[in-house]
Structure formats: structure tokens, C-alpha cells
UniProtKB/Swiss-Prot annotation:
EC number, UniProt record: 6.3.4.2
Domain (Glutamine amidotransferase type-1) ranges: 295-547
Organism: Paraburkholderia phymatum (strain DSM 17167 / CIP 108236 / LMG 21445 / STM815) (Burkholderia phymatum)
Lineage: Bacteria, Pseudomonadati, Pseudomonadota, Betaproteobacteria, Burkholderiales
Pathway(s) of this molecule: Pyrimidine metabolism; CTP biosynthesis via de novo pathway; CTP from UDP: step 2/2
Protein's UniProt name: CTP synthase
Length: 553
């Protein structure tokens, strides 16, 4: 039978519940247990797909095409279990499901209320999510409850967790509460009162935490832990200090050293072998002892909130681990390039243009792409970054000066990138869309396998085929491919059913390393293995850096 660990948060948001939950999962998995994770989001949006990256951060896409919270990316990076649509649900989905049932008459004329109907639905979603785990029936399902204790939006989720714990019985569920212990500089001391109040609030709604994870910018002294223990009625050995570190991949070892996994196993009566975190120690060792260093410029319009590119940043860190190369990322606002030109790019060892939507900042990205192509600087374009690379090539090499995407200019005569109106989904069914379609859930989403053209750089990186995740509406227009190929551009991978361009590159006779991909490879990168495309990109950046140093000498 699956046992549950509910992870809640208090005092403030953004303390790192997702990292804490993923780290605990990693330790339990290293003990031989089958683990899955779920994220409950209290917002009323059905999913984060149409939310602004400035508001929500990155949208993480699962293998089965769900647009989910970025914490699911952390989950996949920390454990081997793959996430699915059922691993993340929102208040919007819960209410949508309950209202649909009410309209069908499933409640037999009863008054539909938050308790029991909404809370029962939440419990059903949690159990269904755990049961659908890709690892088979999990020993442990770790359930992260979004928001903070005291938020009105989170109350139904917390009540559902309380009811579920009671229903499942002793040793079947436990609660881990992540809370803030701030350091007040003027007083020169850590303050435990916010944590005391947070636990008190949790207890008021009937939840008694088994473990406290106390976040601070420094290690919390034992006397402060004892104080927290006394006022929160949590045993002192279950008051765990979680301090700031320079790499999230150090956190599993930090939590294990303080016995978190043993506490959970004891509380849930789980029998498991000792934890083996050697792989995490090795990763941290490689991360901290690089043999070379490169600087990569990430050119985007959401650079003020780097959470918008979370998986991409982590994928570069993974490549750093596996190439023994320190990767410094410079975030470059594409709108500034439109105004000030590309001089700010000239010290970079490589340029990366990530995915995005909308016209704003696109001409700045195109300037960056032209610079990378002409200066022979390694370039990687992801999703929109590939589309803009094709547009730049069409304009500046092929000579189609007004080439554009219909996303930005409906009237352009040279629609090099356009909206595809019909395609096959993962089940082989025909999906259709138009400019007037709803934004939510109308993109090409999820994993798709496609063959790679022999003799290309793509084949060197991936092998015979590629299986990556998608999130986009617009595609490179096949009508212009002959002209693009006539200019030297290579379409190195295509979808098998619709024959749509999935990868492009320039031959080495034109550029040492210039690659664009329509999919999002960052979603499948893990610290354990890295990702072949990002490793190749970092190696190309390193080669460019070394060549530049030799030229200066």
C-alpha cells in the first residue's frame, strides 16, 4: 500500500518546498523505495499554460503533454520516476471536475459544498496521481501542497490532506512543514517566532507536523532548534536545519545527514536499506572542480525572472557537470539589443536563444542570431530560437528581406514560420487549430519521436532518432525549405507523420556549431546523465573559448 508524505509551507512562499520534496524523494529512492511526487496548486487556472512567465515562472511539459508547475521539473531531475499529467493539479481542475459531475447529476440533487465534495475530489485526485506513477505502485507518494498555511486558497487542500491522513490510519501518512527562520541583522540573531506561529496555524486546522524543515540563510544552532521544538511540540531531532547552499544538488546529503529519511521511514513503518548518495557526492565534486570555464549568453525577454528558464539553466548545469566545464550564464535582454546593438555579445563563448511567445524582443534576438552566425560563435536555438534562426537565415542569406513568422506579422508575403492547422496527437488522432482557437491546451505538446538525417551534426549528437518534448503552435513552413536548403541550411530531423522540420543546422563549412531545435530538450536533462545536446553545446563553447585565447596569445 502506498504511504503519503504531505509537504506544506509556512510564513512565506518560495522557500523551496519543491526542492525539499524532491530531495527527500531522492534519498528514499536511494534506499530502494519506489517514490513518486505530486504537486497541488491552489490557483484557479486550469493549468499554468496561459500564465505569464513573470507571474508563474517556467511551464514544465511532461512526456504525456501536460503543462505543469516548474516543480515537476525538479521532481524529474531528482528521481527516476517520470511525471505525468496526474502528478499536478490545480483548484481550477478540481472545481471543473466537481461542477461537471454536478451537471451530470452524480451528486443526486445534494447541495455541493467545499466539504465534503471538493475535499473528496482532491483526495481522489491525489490517490489517482499516486496510482498512475510510472514506477509502478509506489511505496511513498510525496505530496507538495502549494502556497502557505493561512492562505484562503490552500485551505481545501490542507483539509483534504488532514482527512486523508485520518482515513488511511496510523503510519500511513505524515506531515513535513517547511518554514522560515529569518536572521534579523539589526538584532544579530535568528528569530523563531514566525515558525512558532506557522506551526500554531497548522495545528489550528488539525494538522500536527511530524517534521519541521527550518529554512535560514545559515545553519540553525542547537539551542534555537530546541526552542522551536518546545514551542511547536515537535521532537528536537525532527527540527531540521536547511540553510542556503550554492547548489541544490547538495540538499539531499544535507537532509540525510540530519536523519530526515530515517524519521520518515520510522513514522511510516517502512523497511529500507541504508541510503547511498554517492552519485550526488560525485556530481557536487565535479561541479565544484571544473577543468575549464565558458560564458554563455542567454538572450530572452523574461531574463528579469530567471525562473522562467529554470529547466534550461539546470540543463546547462548538468552539461557543466558532465563536461568538467564551469558554465557562466549571462542573461541578456533582447529588447536592449534592439536599442543598443550587439557589442554586449562580443565576449561570449556561445549564444543561446530559448523559447518564448509574442513579438516583443524578437528583432533583438534576430540580431543576436545574426551576430552568432557571422562571428562563428556557437549557437543553440530552442523552439522560438530555431524559428528565429530560420527567419534570420531567410532574410540575410537567402535574401527574403521581409521573411517573418505569422505570429509577428500576419501580412508578411514570406511566411517562413506559420501556424500549422492540422497534426496528429500522441494517440494518432487529428488535432486542428486556427488563429481563433483558445490559447489553453491548443499547442503541440508532449514527446514525439522522429528520425534524424544521416551524416548530420544532429546524428553525431543524438544517433538515429530523437524523442523530445514539444510546446509550440508555429512551425517552419515547408514551402520555403527548398530555398533555405539552397542557401546551405540543413533540415536534419523531421516529424514522421507530418514531415515538419524538427531540427536545423548549418554545415561546418559555413559555421563550426549552429543548431536549432523545435522541441524543448531541457525538459529531459537530468544531473545524473546530462543531455547530449547541451553537452555538445558546452563542448563547442569550450572549443571556441580555447581558440579565442590562442588567438589573443
Amino acid at each position: 500500500m502506498t504511504k503519503y508524505v504531505f509537504v506544506t509551507g509556512g510564513v512565506v512562499s518560495s522557500l523551496g518546498k519543491g526542492i525539499a520534496a524532491a530531495s527527500l524523494a531522492a534519498i528514499l529512492e536511494s534506499r530502494g523505495l519506489k517514490v513518486t511526487l505530486l504537486k497541488l496548486d491552489p490557483y484557479i487556472n486550469v493549468d499554468p499554460g496561459t500564465m505569464s512567465p513573470f507571474q508563474h515562472g517556467e511551464v514544465f511539459v511532461t512526456e504525456d503533454g501536460a503543462e505543469t508547475d516548474l516543480d515537476l521539473g525538479h521532481y524529474e531531475r531528482f528521481i527516476s520516476t517520470k511525471m505525468r499529467k496526474a502528478n499536478n493539479f490545480t483548484t481550477g481542475q478540481i472545481y471543473e471536475s466537481v461542477i461537471r459531475k454536478e451537471r451530470r447529476g452524480d451528486y443526486l440533487g445534494k447541495t455541493v459544498q467545499v466539504i465534503p465534495h471538493i475535499t473528496n475530489e482532491i483526495q481522489a485526485f491525489v490517490e489517482r496521481g499516486a496510482a498512475s506513477a510510472t514506477c509502478g505502485e509506489p511505496d511513498v507518494a510525496i505530496v507538495e501542497v502549494g502556497g502557505t498555511v493561512g492562505d484562503i486558497e490552500s485551505l481545501p487542500f490542507l483539509e483534504a490532506a488532514r482527512q486523508m491522513s485520518l482515513r488511511l490510519g496510523r503510519n500511513s501518512a505524515c506531515f513535513v512543514h517547511l518554514t522560515l527562520v529569518p536572521f534579523i541583522a539589526t538584532a544579530g540573531e535568528l528569530k523563531t517566532k514566525p515558525t512558532q506561529h506557522s506551526v500554531q496555524k497548522l495545528r489550528e486546522i488539525g494538522i500536527y507536523p511530524n517534521v519541521l524543515l527550518c529554512r535560514a540563510d545559515r545553519r540553525i544552532p542547537d539551542d534555537e532548534r530546541a526552542k522551536i521544538s518546545m514551542f511547536s511540540n515537535v521532537p528536537e531531532d525532527a527540527v531540521i536545519s536547511v540553510w542556503d547552499v550554492d547548489s541544490i544538488y547538495k540538499i539531499p546529503q544535507m537532509l540525510h545527514d540530519q536523519g530526515l529519511d530515517e524519521l520518515i521511514c520510522e513514522e511510516l513503518k517502512l523497511t529500507a536499506r541504508p541510503a547511498d548518495l554517492s552519485i550526488w557526492s560525485e556530481m557536487v565534486e565535479k561541479l565544484e572542480n571544473p577543468k575549464s570555464e565558458v560564458t554563455i549568453g542567454m538572450v530572452g525577454k523574461y531574463v528579469e525572472l530567471t525562473e522562467s528558464y529554470k529547466s534550461l539553466i539546470e540543463a546547462l548545469r548538468h552539461a557543466s557537470i558532465h563536461t568538467s566545464t564551469k558554465v557562466n550564464i549571462e542573461y541578456i535582454d533582447s529588447e536592449e539589443l534592439e536599442e543598443n546593438g550587439v557589442d554586449s555579445l562580443k565576449h561570449l563563448d556561445a549564444v543561446l536563444v530559448p523559447g518564448g511567445f509574442g513579438r516583443r524582443g524578437t528583432e533583438g534576438k534576430i540580431k543576436a542570431i545574426r551576430y552568432a552566425r557571422e562571428a562563428k560563435v556557437p549557437y543553440l536555438g530552442i523552439c522560438l530560437g530555431m524559428q528565429l534562426a530560420v527567419i534570420e537565415f531567410a532574410r540575410d542569406v537567402v535574401g527574403l528581406k521581409d521573411a517573418n513568422s505569422t505570429e509577428f506579422d500576419q501580412d508578411t508575403p514570406n511566411r517562413v514560420v506559420a501556424l500549422i492547422t492540422e497534426w496528429y496527437d500522441r494517440e494518432g488522432k487529428v488535432e486542428k487549430r486556427t488563429e481563433e482557437s483558445d490559447l489553453g491546451g491548443t499547442m503541440r505538446l508532449g514527446s514525439q519521436r522522429c528520425p534524424i538525417k544521416p551524416g548530420t551534426m544532429a546524428e553525431e549528437i543524438y544517433g538515429k532518432d530523437v524523442n523530445e518534448r514539444h510546446r509550440h503552435r508555429y512551425e517552419v513552413n515547408n514551402r520555403f525549405v527548398p530555398q533555405l536548403e539552397g542557401g546551405g541550411l540543413i533540415i536534419s530531423a523531421r516529424t514522421p507523420s507530418e514531415d515538419l522540420p524538427e531540427m536545423m543546422e548549418l554545415p561546418r563549412s559555413m559555421h563550426p556549431w549552429f543548431v536549432g531545435v523545435q522541441f524543448h530538450p531541457e525538459f529531459t536533462s537530468t544531473p545524473r546523465d546530462g543531455h547530449p545536446l547541451f553537452k555538445a553545446f558546452v563542448e563547442a563553447a569550450r572549443a571556441h573559448h580555447e581558440a579565442s585565447v590562442e588567438e589573443k596569445v
